[in-house]
């Protein structure tokens, strides 16, 4: 399970092409939430990001598909997805690429679209996140 969470966190961080210090710092929070070793978790995620840089679109899609497969418990899937949404907005911005990757992850985790949208709207408003996505959640 730890490897799947690391891969998904790497995908979210990588999705907008920018790795912010806030995102890297949030990895420690995420590891703590999931009761995982913080330093190892962060190191592996950063290594995964380097692997993602080398992938084409099809490889990236398969990477997401593999990282989301086999997580049968809905509450665990939801908990992971909630943390990934927080990770996506931790730098104060939400763009098309992050929205798109979260949509793909939610689909593969079988998280309902309404859950994704409602919770993202809440997080965006609660944290005063700047939305630069065509899927402008701040207007919902």
Regions found by a protein language model. Give the residues of each.
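Small-residue-enriched hydrophobic alpha-helices in membranes
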Residues: 1-140
